[in-house]
Structure formats: C-alpha cells, structure tokens
Amino acid sequence: MEKEEIAALIDAAASPHIALAIHLLFATAGRIGAVLDLTWDRVEFQRGIINLRLDNAKTRKGRAIVPMNAGIRAALKTAHDAALSDYVIEYAGGKVKNIRKGFEAACRRAKLDNVTLHTIRHSSAVAMVSNGVPLEKVAQYLGHSNVAITYQTYARFAPDHLQDAAEILDFVRIREAR
C-alpha cells in the first residue's frame, strides 16, 4: 500500500478504536491478534516502546517489541487520555475482539480493494525493506524468529536486491572495457 492509501484508510475509519487499530497495525507491523491484545502496561511512553509480546503467549507466532514513531505516540497519548479499560483497542470500556466489519467498511469508504488486515503487516514490511532497512532489523521488527523467513518473503523489495549480480552480467560494458 502507498502512503496516500494508508492515510486514506485511517481517515476512513468511522470509529476511533478502528482508526487506532489500523494506525497501530501499520506502525508496529504487528498481527491483528497482537494489536487487539495490547494493554496499556505494555505501552511505555517514557522509553518510547510498544511491547506486543505476551508473557503467557498461546500463539506460536513471534511478537516483537518495537519503538514508537511520533505519529503513533500522539495517537496513543490521545487514546490513553480517554481510556476506560486496560486495553489499548477498546470500545465502551471493553476489549475489542474483532475489527473486521469496521476495517472492511473503512476499506470501502477509502475505495481500497483486496486489502486485508494482514495486507497492512505486509505493507509495513515492504515499506521498511524498500527504504533500505536491513532485513535483520525488519525480521526483528516483525518478530520473526529467523531472518530466513524475512529474506524469503521480502528480499525482492530491497532497492539493491540482486544489483551486484546484474552488474556482473553487464556484458556490453565488459566488451566496451576491452
């Protein structure tokens, strides 16, 4: 997804909890389960980190501890000031279990087709890789236990991926150098 589409999707969310969830998904590159499980005690404004990990995690999927950027920090501060529960994503003081309907409605309003909640995680990873963030850091950000997983999925989005191989095969330049 492009930056304009991301902004349009967040703006198209009809409810503050849907907008915050979408913003968190992009900012953390987290999975929806991790974002919906997030509690305020794992949002550390002082240190500038968001801890998506659970102590008693029943999931086999890795979860990360990620830094806050300025945009998500501001959104989280606003939400924290109005919080009625321990959960970051809440509605009427209770934990939100699913945002699918609100997310799909936001996609329709933003005129975005074929966008899923997991598309957001993928878009965040692609944005990091295509802007030169090393795959090792992207793997850590995504909570991947092995950088090979990240490499297999996202290496092709790196701006210089395979460029050195292409240069070796530049036979026209090699012939001109003779």
Locations of regions flagged by a protein language model:
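C-terminal catalytic core of Y-nucleophile DNA break-rejoin enzymes
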Residues: 10, 57-77, 85-105, 116
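Catalytic-site neighborhood detector that most strongly recognizes the C-terminal catalytic loop/helix
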Residues: 54-60, 142-168
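C-terminal catalytic core of tyrosine-transesterase DNA break-rejoin enzymes
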Residues: 19, 23, 27-34, 102-105, ...
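Conserved catalytic core of the tyrosine transesterase superfamily
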Residues: 8-23, 58-59
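Conserved tyrosine-mediated DNA breakage-rejoining catalytic core shared by Y-recombinases
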Residues: 3-5, 28, 33, 37-78
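Phosphate-coordinating loops and pocket residues in cytosolic domains that bind phosphorylated ligands
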Residues: 11, 37, 45, 152, ...
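C-terminal secondary-structure termini that scaffold catalytic or DNA-interacting sites
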Residues: 47, 58, 77-78, 82, ...
